[in-house]
Curated annotation (Swiss-Prot):
Cleaved signal peptide residues: 1
Protein name (Swiss-Prot/TrEMBL): Hemagglutinin-esterase-fusion glycoprotein
Chief localization: virion
Organism phylogeny: Viruses, Riboviria, Orthornavirae, Negarnaviricota, Polyploviricotina
EC primary class: hydrolase
Organism field: Influenza C virus (strain C/Pig/Beijing/439/1982)
UniProt xrefs under InterPro entries: Capsid_hemagglutn, Hemagglutn-estrase_core, Hemagglutn-estrase_hemagglutn, Hemagglutn_stalk_influenz-C
Ranges in the topological domain labelled Extracellular: 2-617
Keyword Hydrolase on entry: yes
Active site: S58, D353, H356
Ranges where the record places region Fusion domain-2: 353-638
Length: 642
């Protein structure tokens, strides 16, 4: 009788790279980084398509006769906008004669504002003020601030009021022989000579708790008054000083100007200038007292429900060639904590006309069609990687990547994976210790193809018991890592959240500190990923060793009395009793056996966070169960000895 020895061979060459892990090591033909660096896309996007709203003008107005050529957004995004050609939030607040008056209102956790150009130097609105840019800046800033704290907002275009009987609505030559809708100008008709100076005015207005279906917890009110250079300019008849003051229901002064206690400007001029301060007032009844002759009466407001903190994006709104713009929107957003500003890099060049349908702006706003994982001043990201090459400028919200160098990201094995020998006392021993970990004294198991034929055998753990790391223990390990990481980061997250509210007060110092914190977080995350990588490698290695044990057990079971196991992975067969077809059945599974499969290794890691926290992440979680790695066996190397 001729007896031969058939073994699973140990083979590996210099093309393999070694990967060390907790509980076991691997050789692999390939390797890949756990994550690739992502690059943010410039422009605006949103975290959730169902929770955002926009306010715009003709560039987002679907009813415009030139739509879609006039639009800077897609038709899908235009449906989200509350827009009317020629409109702006400030025009609706003040209501200059002859201008579009649109009822802006809507609800959303994330609010995008792309409007403002229709009140700019080009429109040349006067009404006792040649340059409205400062008022526009304060108005837009107040809108952004309150919008970031509210779910819903609405223009209130008719406040309840009580006006003195002797006062009637007045007009002004420098306001198209009309006047603003808000504030309204009321004047006294003075007849008796002894009353030539007139009487003081007392009026009342009420800020509602609700306007239509919109709840109002806070109102933005324009407190407007005149500024005179001197008392003589105000009243050449020698009457008293000018004043216009707003009081709340308790008699406290909340706005206005009183030249009885405040000096005049002292400049030379004979025409007053109207000033409007932006007040944030609670619902209630307010009184307005003014010096004789006339009264500026608040008749509109913007109301906010103040129900939740949200996101605000402001888009630069400028004219194209030949028209003068201001940059109040830009300045207002930059001076409002948490406001993200979208700015053009080139002049506005329209498609429909010089001022509508700019290609660069369309690209910057194209992200509004999608959901992003992170939005920031640097742009938006929808990839899952936790790392980016450059630091993302705040404000930023969502699951934002941290800055890292590519070479610092850990690598994991890929391709053909071979477990090494080693000892891990935490691993449950298989029932039969064929290819047990402690038995793998030298070399690596590598099953190579000797002769073509079979479809292959996919190795991996197909049992919930036996050797190797169990699914339950692996999941518990990853859960513990996630909890530890959250504890590690919690104090940092709280600190950064507080810094977000202070960013505008000491901007550079805060930004520098924030950058240091984010760098530390990036280094910590890289270290955490290194631990996870080592656990993955060990988990895969142990699982593959168990799979080899399963393969050896399968061979022994198939052989029965025809083959005698003489050492781990080696059998003696009588060639005269078990011919080639017999050996093929034992070792090649007769070339017809179905190929068992298991899920491939999934190393996807997801960084979870509060979607409106402007830092990065609050914790780390494995999004899907970790499967043991798969090793494809194309055949069995046969080492014959007589």
């Amino acid at each position: 009788a001729e007896k031969i020895k058939i073994c699973l061979q140990k083979q590996v060459n210099s093309s393999f790279s070694l990967h060390n892990g907790f509980g076991g090591n691997l050789y692999a033909t390939e390797e890949k980084r756990m994550f690739e660096l992502v690059k943010p896309k410039a422009g605006a996007s949103v975290l959730n398509q169902s929770t955002w709203i926009c306010f715009g003008d003709s560039r987002t107005d679907q009813s415009n006769s030139a739509f879609p050529r006039s639009a800077d957004v897609s038709a899908k995004t235009a449906e989200k906008f509350r827009s009317l050609s020629g409109g702006s939030l400030m025009l609706s607040m003040f209501g200059p004669p002859g201008k579009v008056d649109y009822l802006y209102q809507g609800c959303g956790k994330h609010k995008v504002f792309y409007e403002g150009v229709n009140w700019s130097p080009h429109t040349a609105i006067d009404c006792y003020r040649k340059n409205w840019t400062d008022i526009k800046l304060n108005f837009q800033k107040s809108i952004y601030e309150l919008a970031s704290q509210s779910h819903c907002m609405s223009l209130v275009n008719a406040l309840d009021k009580t006006i003195p009987l002797q006062a009637t609505k007045g007009v002004a030559k420098n306001c198209n022989n009309s006047f603003l809708k808000n504030p309204a100008l009321y004047t006294q008709e003075v007849k008796p000579l002894d009353q030539i100076c007139g009487e003081e005015n007392l009026a009342f207005f009420t800020l509602p708790t609700q306007f239509g279906t919109y709840e109002c917890k806070l109102h933005l009110v324009a407190s407007c008054y005149f500024i005179y250079d001197s008392k003589e300019v105000y009243n050449k008849r020698g009457c008293g000083n000018y004043f216009q003051v707003i009081y709340d229901s308790s008699g406290k002064v909340v706005g206005g100007l009183d030249n009885r206690v405040s000096p005049y400007t002292g400049n030379s001029g004979d025409t007053p200038t109207m000033q409007c301060d932006m007040l944030q007032l609670k619902p209630g009844r307010y009184s307005v007292r003014s010096s004789p002759r006339f009264l500026l009466m608040p008749e509109r407001s913007y109301c906010f429900d103040m129900k939740e903190k949200g996101l605000v994006t402001a888009v630069q709104s400028i004219w194209g060639k030949g028209r003068k713009s201001d940059y109040a929107v830009d300045q207002a957003c930059l001076s409002t904590p948490g406001c993200m500003l979208i700015q053009k890099q080139k002049p506005y060049i329209g498609e429909a006309d010089d001022h509508h349908g700019d290609q660069e702006m369309r690209e910057l706003l194209s992200g509004l069609d999608y959901e992003a994982r992170c939005i920031s001043q640097s742009g938006w990201v929808n990839e899952t990687s936790p790392f980016t090459e450059e630091y993302l400028l705040p404000p930023k919200f969502g699951r934002c990547p941290l800055a890292a160098k590519e070479e610092s990201i850990p690598k994991i094995p890929d391709g053909l994976l071979i477990p090494t020998s080693g000892t891990d006392t935490t691993v449950t021993k298989p029932k039969s210790r064929i290819f047990g970990i402690d038995d793998l004294i030298i070399g690596l198991f590598f099953v190579a193809i000797v002769e073509a034929g079979i479809g292959g055998y996919l190795l991996g753990s197909r049992k919930e018991s036996g050797g190797g790391v169990t699914k339950e223990s692996a999941e518990k390990g990853f859960e513990k890592i996630g909890n530890d990481i959250q504890i590690l980061r919690s104090s940092t997250n709280i600190a950064i959240e507080k810094l977000n509210d202070r960013i505008s007060h000491d901007e550079q110092a805060i930004r520098d500190l924030t950058l240091e914190i984010e760098n530390a977080r990036s280094e910590a995350l890289l270290g955490e990923l290194g631990i996870i990588r080592a656990l993955l490698v060990g988990n895969i290695s142990i699982g593959l060793q168990e799979s080899l044990w399963e393969l050896a057990s399968e061979i022994t079971n198939r052989a029965g009395d025809l083959a005698v196991e003489v050492s781990p992975g080696c059998w003696i067969i009588d060639n005269n009793i078990c011919d080639q077809s017999c050996q093929n059945f034992i070792f090649k599974f007769n070339e017809t056996a179905p190929v068992p499969t298991i899920p491939p290794l999934d190393t996807k890691i997801d960084l979870q966070s509060d979607p409106f926290y402007w830092g990065s992440s609050l914790g780390l979680a494995i999004t899907t169960p970790i499967s043991l790695a798969a090793l494809v066996i194309s055949g069995i190397a046969i080492c014959r000895t007589k």
